[in-house]
Amino acid sequence: MRAPLLLPLLPLLLFGVSSGNNDKTTHSTTVSPETTKQITTITVTTSQVQGSISASKPSSTAPTAVMSFTKAQEAATSSKQHDSSTSSIPPPSTSITPSIITTSPQGKTPSTPALTHTPDQNTKTTGRQDDTSHVSVASTSASQQVSSSASAAVPTTTSAVTSSATQQKVSPTDSSEILLKPSASPNSTQVTSPSRTPKGFLSTVTTSPHIADNGSTALNQLKSTVSSSEVPVSSFLDKDHSVSSSTSATNQHLSLSSHRPTSPVPKFECSTPHSGSVPSTSSKTSLSSPSSSTKNATVTTTMTTAKAAYTSQGDGSVTHKSGVTAQSPTSAPLPTPTLKDHMKSKSPDQTHSNVSPPNEVICEDQIGEVRPILNLKEEKTCDDWKKASNEAFFEVFCSGRRHAFNSTRDRCTVKLASSNHRRWAVHVIVHRVLDPAAVFEELKEKRNELEKLGITNVTYLNQEMEEEIKDQSSTPLIITIVTLAGSLLLIAAIYGCCHQRFSQKKSQQRLTEELQTMENGYHDNPTLEVMETGSEMQEKKVNLNGELGDSWIVPLDTIMKEDLEEEDTHL
């Protein structure tokens, strides 16, 4: 009851004592609870800060210890303990190497974590062992005040850490849990929850930080690697414990309060293996915790834990996931497999559909049908034929008159059958790939067949089939008709010219005869004169001949006829 009343006066007293102590010291706190409890030794070395320790009074069943460091104001409260407690304030140093060793007088060895942190970091560790659990809470802050109180009848250990904008609740399983939570200063946050391993194996945690500071606006990066190793220890008992950490802007009425409203704390998941022999796996956790100032901290943590899916202890149930990865916006994302990578990962047995299958020679024992027979000079077996089947061999058997065999495009199968090795029956099957342009031309000529199949049009390279295909027989018919017509016209022209010429000749001959008759003047009728001309000429000739013979011989009949004709003419 006296401890709460002395709290306002003790910070002033301890402030003077701590300001005078500037030498490098080592702070050691030894808490010895009852005979049924364990002895915890904590060694902490800090840099550029001054610390104050507030140790609460342990109860008969569960003690509670809270420790915090500040730069400006420090407070320390010491309460009554059952056995003894020794406290000392460490001075600044260049590195921090805290180690926590917990031993049990009852022959039970708990987990022994070893932590190493960088400068400008305040670490507060509370070690406690109630036969089954070990809770360690670390809080970093630029200005903190610590007040601790303990009740005499609290059955479990409860530690509350107040930061800003984050609330996290972790329920460990069997053996121990270490919770490190950052606040305003650029520090790292690590959570490791090792559970009870089979046959008393423990987990040892080692952290190797590295911080690079480049001024007020530089980036603070922290890379830590957590490795888990197995150490044989005695078995542990199962007991339910709960550690809750909540955020508040002003105060916390449990044990520890820290007011940093502008410093968000990242949330992450921890992995806890279930009891039993399970193989260990590796997982990576990357966190980014920005502070209220211009500094940022990036934490990369590699945790090696055992595979566990679900763990339930007592009243509280906790689901643990192994291999959980949390990434900050600044961390690089993991590469995801793409469709291209999936296509590259296919087996090389799969052949491309555009590649033609190889040519082959198939031998048969019996001749199924009438085939050409090859007579050989020497006997050959099927293996001899296959050895001789090169490109020239297939060009000889697979080439035709109209189409030459192309080994890169076409496929040829030669089947040989024989009962006698000197006589082979050959059967050739050629799978020929047609040229697309030739196929288009062939389809253009088969419009009617395509319409029967329901095909209306065929296009190739922006070319379409013609709407109407002309009849090939119509052109020769037209040519024949035109030729016959021309021939008839030519014959008609020739006939007309010849007929006109003959008619002109006849007319000229008649005119000539009439002119000759008129000149003679014998008769009025030119027709008669023409007819008489011949007889007269004959008579004259006769007369001439008669004159030569000195005789005039004139037949009487001729004279009588001439007289009659003259009479008729005159009439």
UniProtKB/Swiss-Prot annotation:
Subcellular location: Apical cell membrane; Cell projection, Microvillus; Membrane raft; Cell projection, Lamellipodium
Keyword terms, alphabetized: Cell adhesion, Cell membrane, Cell projection, Glycoprotein, Membrane, Signal, Transmembrane, Transmembrane helix
Tissue expression from the record: Expressed in thrombocytes, kidney podocytes, vascular endothelia and mono- and multipotent progenitors from the bone marrow (at protein level).
Basic and acidic residues composition-biased segments: 339-349
Known function: Involved in the regulation of both adhesion and cell morphology and cancer progression. Functions as an anti-adhesive molecule that maintains an open filtration pathway between neighboring foot processes in the podocyte by charge repulsion. Acts as a pro-adhesive molecule, enhancing the adherence of cells to immobilized ligands, increasing the rate of migration and cell-cell contacts in an integrin-dependent manner. Involved in the formation of a preapical plasma membrane subdomain to set up initial epithelial polarization and the apical lumen formation during renal tubulogenesis.
UniProt free text on domains: Both the O-glycan-rich domain of the extracellular domain and the C-terminus PDZ-binding motif (DTHL) in the cytoplasmic tail harbor an apical sorting signal. The cytoplasmic domain is necessary for the apical membrane targeting and renal tubulogenesis. The large highly anionic extracellular domain allows to maintain open filtration pathways between neighboring podocyte foot processes. The cytoplasmic C-terminus PDZ-binding motif (DTHL) is essential for interaction with NHERF1 and for targeting NHERF1 to the apical cell membrane. The extracellular domain is necessary for microvillus formation.
Protein name listed in UniProt: Podocalyxin
Gene name of the record: PODXL
